């Protein structure tokens, strides 16, 4: 069972996506994160932590199926990248590389099976996301989805 940490639960209970994102980033020892919400068929940036201003403009609107967040939304499953800077899979868009981050995880925010958005977190170093951590991030995303 994935127990959502108190700091994240408190922020979620208050409806504050920015605080919930900051608590999630801190809990996993990450340096950056985003929350995109599904609006009019595209993902719109709703909260971000430590994303450079030029990148915020690039990732403000993300089409479903494009980039890491768009792929997580399209597949409705986690997308992990060990190193954004050296990835050759074709999944990583220039905006993601411009963050300077390496280990990235994006998960869909689902409420009753319906896509509501995508939660993304990233570390400054290369990182293979363990299954248990990925499962907890999915649980956090599900908790945030109805907000």
Predicted regions and their residues:
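Signal-transmission linkers at sensory-effector interfaces
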Residues: 1-15, 147
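Helix-loop-beta substructure at the N-terminus of cytosolic sensory domains
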Residues: 9-46, 56-58, 66
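Regulatory sensory and allosteric helical modules in signal-transduction proteins
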Residues: 38, 42, 46, 54-87
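Signal-transducing coupling segments at domain and membrane junctions
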Residues: 52-57, 82-103, 123
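Sensory-domain boundary capping and coupling elements
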Residues: 69, 109-123
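Signal-transmission/dimerization alpha-helices at domain junctions
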Residues: 74-78, 112, 136-147
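A short, aliphatic-rich beta-strand micro-motif
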Residues: 102-110
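Regulatory loop-to-helix N-cap segments in sensory/regulatory domains
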Residues: 122-140
């Amino acid at each position: 069972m994935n127990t959502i940490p108190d700091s994240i639960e408190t922020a979620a209970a208050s409806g504050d996506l920015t605080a919930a994102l900051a608590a999630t980033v801190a809990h996993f020892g990450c340096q950056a994160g985003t929350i995109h919400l599904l609006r009019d068929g595209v993902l719109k940036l709703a909260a971000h932590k430590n994303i450079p201003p030029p990148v915020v403009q690039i990732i403000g609107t993300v089409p479903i199926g494009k980039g890491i967040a768009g792929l997580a939304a399209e597949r409705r499953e986690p997308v992990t990248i060990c190193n954004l800077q050296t990835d050759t899979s074709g999944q990583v868009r220039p905006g993601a590389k411009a963050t300077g981050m390496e280990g990235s995880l994006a998960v869909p925010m689902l409420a009753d099976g319906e896509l509501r958005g995508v939660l993304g977190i990233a570390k400054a170093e290369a990182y293979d996301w363990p299954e248990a951590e990925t499962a907890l991030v999915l649980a956090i995303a599900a908790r945030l989805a109805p907000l």
